[in-house]
Amino acid sequence: MTYREVLEYLDARPPRGERRGLERMRLLMHKLGDPQRSLRFVHIAGTSGKGSTAAMTERMLRACGYRTGLFVSPHTFDFRERIQLDGVMADKALLAETLTEMRPALDALDAMGDPAAAFETMTALALCVFARKKPDLVVLEVGIGGLLDSTNIIDPPEVAAVCAISVEHTNLLGKTIPEIAAQKCGII
């Protein structure tokens, strides 16, 4: 695959899975050899401020001499903003090579009729990239919620942080602050 094909492939993935939960992500990561198990994480959830908190945390860790990975969403200009190593966007060739290696596992889920959604695929791609490059710590920003978010496929993190919480995504997380907070705190 080329980098352009990576972007096209990700764009063609379904926006959401047929079922909500981590079952599909667990199966995908198992088929990929559970690369996330070789990594240490700082996991960050919240309604607002989580991206800024993730970026600041990554910079502080790097300033302290740690080799870092960073996974955030969405991106502003370049998809590679989502997956960074030591403060630098992931190399296009690295992303293409990694997704090429992931394709048999992704194709297997497709053949089962339960394809990995776009964000699940991006999360898996980031985790596989990080497993290859072996940073000391990965700062991982939750997509939506926490408890059932694809980033919650990791083992308990070194640190879990929950930023400000407000009413959002009520169709997925609940209608009240306590319901939404329970979802976000699912990363702890």
Per-region residue spans from a language model:
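Conserved Switch II/interswitch segment of TRAFAC-class P-loop GTPases
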Residues: 164-171
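Inter-motif core of Ras-like GTPase G domains
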Residues: 153-164
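ATP-dependent carboxylate-amine ligase
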Residues: 1, 11, 155-156, 178
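Short, glycine/serine-rich, charged loops/turns that create anion-binding
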Residues: 49, 75, 166
